[in-house]
């Protein structure tokens, strides 16, 4: 089983790819898709589309986990929702099963509390993946936490 966790955004889309092999969780790749602030929004969305397609074609995940987005009154809300729509479209076009999790669900599953801190989440990601140093940048660590939430739901604790 191979899963991609995705932390949506317009400026940065975090991703983390984990494989289960002999009941061990193995980190295959993590990072961010960054779009330049100097580009037009439609070009940034297209960049997410292209880069995510490349990642999926390279790693062939069998499932995906994406952070749910809740409406907040913010000038970036619409942009993030549009980026999330592009992400969901790419996953649907590849026939990848998608699970969605709220930030509180992710925190509860990974760190044992729906109000866990960023450090608690990072520590849990490092522990679960047997990492010596934290994944960078933070968006990729968040994406790994999202993927680990899905794996936990599927019984890979």
From Swiss-Prot:
Q: Which GO terms describe its cellular component?
A: cytoplasm; Holliday junction resolvase complex
List residues traversing the bilayer.
none
Q: What is its main location?
A: cytoplasm
Q: Which domain of life is it from?
A: Bacteria
Q: Which cysteine pairs are covalently linked by disulfides here?
A: none
Catalytic residues in the record: 7, 67, 139
Q: Where is it localised?
A: Cytoplasm
Cofactor, how bound (note)? Binds 2 Mg(2+) ion per subunit.
The record's keywords, sorted A to Z, are: Cytoplasm, DNA damage, DNA recombination, DNA repair, DNA-binding, Endonuclease, Hydrolase, Magnesium, Metal-binding, Nuclease
Tell me the gene name.
ruvC
GO function term, MF aspect, one: magnesium ion binding
Output this protein's name: Crossover junction endodeoxyribonuclease RuvC
| InterPro entries noted in UniProt | RNaseH-like_sf, RNaseH_sf, X-over_junc_endoDNase_RuvC
Pfam families assigned? RuvC
EC number(s) reported in the record: 3.1.21.10
Of which family is this protein a member?
Answer: Belongs to the RuvC family.
Q: So what does this one do?
A: The RuvA-RuvB-RuvC complex processes Holliday junction (HJ) DNA during genetic recombination and DNA repair. Endonuclease that resolves HJ intermediates. Cleaves cruciform DNA by making single-stranded nicks across the HJ at symmetrical positions within the homologous arms, yielding a 5'-phosphate and a 3'-hydroxyl group; requires a central core of homology in the junction. The consensus cleavage sequence is 5'-(A/T)TT(C/G)-3'. Cleavage occurs on the 3'-side of the TT dinucleotide at the point of strand exchange.
Detail which positions bind Mg(2+) 2: 67
Cofactor(s) the protein needs:
Mg(2+)
A GO biological process held by the record? DNA repair
**The reaction(s) this protein catalyses:** Endonucleolytic cleavage at a junction such as a reciprocal single-stranded crossover between two homologous DNA duplexes (Holliday junction)
Subunit comment: Homodimer which binds Holliday junction (HJ) DNA. The HJ becomes 2-fold symmetrical on binding to RuvC with unstacked arms; it has a different conformation from HJ DNA in complex with RuvA. In the full resolvosome a probable DNA-RuvA(4)-RuvB(12)-RuvC(2) complex forms which resolves the HJ.
For Mg(2+) 1, which residues are the binding ones?
Answer: 7, 139
């Amino acid at each position: 089983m191979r899963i991609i966790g995705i932390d949506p955004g317009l400026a940065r889309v975090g991703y983390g790819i984990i494989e289960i092999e002999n009941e061990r969780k193995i980190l295959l790749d993590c990072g961010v898709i960054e779009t330049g602030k100097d580009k037009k929004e439609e070009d940034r969305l297209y960049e997410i589309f292209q880069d995510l397609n490349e990642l999926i074609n390279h790693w062939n995940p069998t499932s995906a986990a994406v952070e749910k987005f809740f409406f907040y009154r913010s000038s970036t809300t619409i942009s993030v929702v549009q980026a999330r729509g592009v992400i969901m479209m790419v996953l649907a076009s590849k026939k990848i099963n998608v699970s969605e999790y709220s930030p509180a669900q992710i925190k509860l599953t990974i760190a044992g509390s729906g109000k866990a801190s960023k450090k608690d989440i990072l520590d849990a990601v490092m522990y679960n993946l047997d990492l010596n140093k934290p994944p960078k940048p933070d968006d990729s660590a968040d994406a790994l936490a999202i993927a680990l939430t899905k794996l936990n739901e599927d019984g890979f604790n």
